[in-house]
UniProtKB/Swiss-Prot annotation:
GO terms for cellular component: cell outer membrane; transporter complex. Keywords: Cell outer membrane, Membrane, Signal. Component of the lipopolysaccharide transport and assembly complex. Interacts with LptE and LptA. It is found in: Cell outer membrane. The lineage of its organism: Bacteria, Pseudomonadati, Pseudomonadota, Gammaproteobacteria, Oceanospirillales. Together with LptE, is involved in the assembly of lipopolysaccharide (LPS) at the surface of the outer membrane. The keyword Membrane applies. GO terms for biological process: Gram-negative-bacterium-type cell outer membrane assembly; lipopolysaccharide transport. Residues 1-30 form the signal peptide. It comes from the Bacteria. It comes from Hahella chejuensis (strain KCTC 2396). This is LPS-assembly protein LptD. Belongs to the LptD family.
């Protein structure tokens, strides 16, 4: 108490001096009577500076501008109030008694970070209580309070404000309250209060509660009898609700999810609940009622330590009514599990587990909302242990599958890897470089329904070793890289057809030469300076033919020919076939690089392979060829700026004068991602031709339309559509889309279209009500998620 009175005595001296002092508020409205705290700092668009306009969205009518305030030459406003004396000025100073002091007329006071403006301030020296009448403004960095009367106890720090309004500048949040009180700086109580992020001229939505408790120490708030109002019309009521007031996680209900069921024309509705179990692990339970199916429950759990991250997702429905109708022999019980774990054992060692399983092949299409499992015929599950460091690499890989489609014959199902051990080593012995890659794999699969007479039951081990020796030679104008690689493989097989070897060895040497030159020049185009390069390249590879027909196919396929295959040593992917090669690739690339930024604006590449011998090694008939030349392979990439991306790649058969394969994509967005345009065309001769168009376009500052059309030109049918509308206000946003998509994406000819409607109602600074909109739109439209990220970072959505 004595220390407090000592600060008071010092404060009185500042007050007396302040009666004739000079103050600066930086606001021409300081002497007017605002109706609320928000109106005091509100500025319409036409009165903003160009700098202030940079953070204002086009549809917003204005924003809040926090003025400069404080006495000239006063202590920093970041000071702690308890350590600062009270400075004040007013028109008059009255001391009616020794225990009282009254400041009247244009009272301005400052203590540390707090700045006060009022009509009258009265200080009781005995009780250390300050009464304020006509409080025009109580400011702290990023915060503004306004009210009728206020009382503050200098000893206990108790504070109360009646007929109050508040403004939080950074969050664009404002509200009113009958009374605001605080027992200390960490606990604030608001009685009959409201909250909104809408501007003070348009109260589109708000939250009202009989009591709101804000616990800054715990980082959470609690509201009693809370009502969400749209245009002053109550639309949702919660008798009690807890919510976070900072970035710390808190348990509680999340905002509802609303969508359509893919059964009939019904809706789906759910209210997730978040469990903040500990600082390093949490869980989310999401019950979702789906019309025509029933109650789907999804549970997501996360666990994080310094070295480990684990995530588990589980979906379960006790009885799917629609599924039971379509599959009378099934119980209707459906489920799915997705588990991932990453463990950084040390700086060099890491373990990764990925386990997925579903009850049936249609689960992911019918029910999946949160599981991160790809819609595939064979669902992978794996465990990896890897080491990387000092030029060495090691990986232990165990991989299995769940074949979700029972119609797939057993011989077409993949082998399990139990395990696959890989080792790599690289070392430079100037001027040569030595490399070694080695891999051991045991392949196994269930052979119960396989035909032993056709060698379908074969399982066994494969050990492949590939040492290499490279002599890299380079200058500023080119390079020459001869390379020798030996590919040796041993097999120990089981359950082979009688007469076929169970022990097989294969050794194939590879000789390759990679050479290129670099020419460049400076040129000017359309007023910009570019550095153009011309890069011819030669690649030769030779490997002799070796009969491999007795070797089973565990994991091997023929790589799809494209531009990227021009400079590869082998045409096979996997270890059961090693190709015979005697071929030369000739290619050339030209680049245009912006001299000011170094960015690549244009790249054009083309090349062709010349075969000097027929390709005799194959998988059945795949991989065999008697052609002397490959099609021309090329690609063109044009990025004139950061907003436009154009790419063409394809294969051209010059002898037949036809395109074998082609793909064209164009993507455009404006600087603020308000306009999006995506075009693509895919073509494979006598097999596939599809076009895909998606667009998002602002009709007005507030309204945007979006759509997509996916069309199959071979089957002359639409295989996907999306149409929607988005309304943006400064404090809320509504999005709705209707989409159709193939039930079986692999069957573009016969698969039926499924339909769905997705919507989201977003309240700025509060949350979303609706479906998992971003997940849907990420698949439908390129750059849509980048648009959402841009809005969140720039406009704090």
């Amino acid at each position: 108490m004595k220390e407090g009175r000592k600060r008071l005595r010092a404060g009185y001296c500042y007050m007396l001096a302040g009666v004739v002092g000079v103050a600066s508020t930086g606001s021409s409205r300081a002497d007017s009577e605002p109706q609320s705290a928000a109106m005091l700092d509100w500025r319409m668009r036409e009165f903003l500076t160009p700098q202030q306009m940079t953070t204002l969205e086009p549809q917003c009518r204005g924003t809040y501008v926090e003025p400069e305030y404080g006495f000239v030459n006063a202590p920093s406003t970041t000071s702690t109030p308890d350590n600062e004396a009270l400075r004040a000025r007013s028109d008059t100073l009255v001391s009616p008694s020794e225990s009282a002091m009254r400041l009247q007329g244009n009272v301005k006071a400052q203590q540390g970070a707090w700045w006060l403006e009022a009509d009258q301030v009265e200080l009781d020296r005995q009780t250390n209580v300050v009464d304020l009448q006509g409080l025009k403004a109580a400011r702290a960095p990023g915060l503004l309070l306004h009210g009728d009367t206020a009382r503050y106890n200098l000893d206990t720090k108790d504070f109360s404000l009646s007929d109050a309004s508040y403004l939080i500048h950074q969050r664009h949040a404002r509200g009113d309250a009958e009374r605001i009180s605080s027992a200390d700086a960490q606990l604030v109580r608001i009685e009959d209060g409201s909250y909104t992020t809408c501007d003070p001229t348009h109260n589109d939505w708000s939250i009202a509660a009989s009591e709101i408790i804000l616990d800054r120490e715990q980082g959470e708030g609690a509201a009693k009898h809370m009502t969400l109002r749209i245009k002053d019309v109550p639309v949702m009521y919660f008798p009690y609700l807890r919510f976070p007031i900072d970035d710390r996680r808190k348990s509680g209900f999340l905002y509802p999810t609303i969508g359509t069921s893919n059964t009939g024309r019904g809706m789906s509705f759910g209210i997730p609940y978040y469990f903040n179990l500990a600082p390093n692990y949490d869980a989310t339970y999401s019950p979702l009622y789906m019309h025509g199916r029933g109650l789907l429950s999804e549970l997501e759990g996360r666990w994080l330590t310094e070295d480990t991250y684990s995530e588990v997702r589980l979906g379960y429905i006790a009885h799917d009514s629609e599924f039971s109708k379509e599959n009378p022999d099934e119980s209707g019980r459906r489920w799915a599990l997705d588990f991932t774990n990453r463990y950084d054992v040390s700086e060099n060692w890491r373990s990764t587990i990925d386990y997925n399983v579903v009850s049936d092949k249609d689960y992911l299409n019918d029910l999946n909302r949160t599981l991160e499992i790809q819609q595939e015929t064979h669902i992978k599950r794996s465990w990896d242990v890897a080491y990387l460091g000092g030029g060495f690499s090691f990986k232990s890989h165990v991989q299995g599958y769940q074949t979700v489609d029972d119609d797939i014959v057993d011989n077409d199902r993949p082998y399990m890897l139990l395990p696959q051990l890989s080792f790599g080593w690289e070392r430079d012995f100037d001027p040569v470089a030595f490399g070694l890659e080695s891999e051991f794999t045991y392949f196994w699969r269930d052979d119960e329904n396989l035909d032993p007479a056709r060698d379908q039951q074969v399982v066994g081990a494969r050990w492949r070793t590939q040492p290499s020796l490279t002599l890299p030679l380079s200058t500023t104008w080119g390079y020459l890289t001869p390379k020798l690689r030996l590919d040796h493989t041993d097999y120990q097989l089981e359950q082979r057809v009688t007469g076929l070897d169970e022990s097989i060895s294969r050794t194939v040497p590879f000789y390759s030469l990679d050479a290129g030159m670099y020419f460049d020049r400076t040129l000017s185009l359309f007023g910009d300076e570019y550095n153009q390069s011309l890069e011819p390249r030669l690649f030769y590879v030779y490997s002799p033919e070796q009969d491999q027909d007795d070797i089973p196919d565990f994991d091997t396929s023929v790589a799809t020919f494209s531009y990227s295959q021009l400079y590869k040593e082998d045409r096979f992917v996997g270890g059961d076939r090693v190709g015979d090669n005697n071929r030369l690739t000739l290619g050339v690339t030209s680049r245009f690089n912006d001299r000011a930024t170094g960015a690549e604006r244009l790249r054009a590449s083309v090349g062709q392979i010349f075969y000097y011998e027929d390709q005799q090694v194959g998988l059945g008939t795949e991989g065999l060829s008697d052609e002397s030349e490959s099609p021309w392979a090329g690609e063109l990439v044009w990025r004139p700026n950061d907003r436009f991306d154009f790419k063409v790649e394809g294969l051209w058969d010059w002898q037949e004068r036809q395109t074998e394969k082609g793909a064209t994509t164009l993507a455009f967005h404006d600087p603020e991602y308000r306009k999006l345009l995506n075009l693509s065309h895919r073509y494979t001769h006598n097999d596939l031709e599809q076009t895909d168009v998606s667009v998002l376009f602002p009709v007005t500052d507030s309204v945007s339309v979006l759509g997509r059309w996916f069309f199959d030109l071979v089957n002359h049918r639409t295989i996907g559509t999306m149409a929607g509308v988005e309304y943006n206000d400064c404090c809320w946003r509504f999005q709705v889309i209707a989409r159709s998509f193939l039930k079986d994406a692999d069957d573009t000819e016969n698969s039926e279209l499924d339909h769905g409607v997705f919507l989201r109602f977003q309240l700025r600074g509060l949350g979303n009500i609706g479906s998992r909109f971003e997940d849907v739109m990420a698949k439908e439209m390129r750059n849509f998620n980048e648009r959402e990220t841009y809005r969140a970072e720039r406009y704090q959505w």
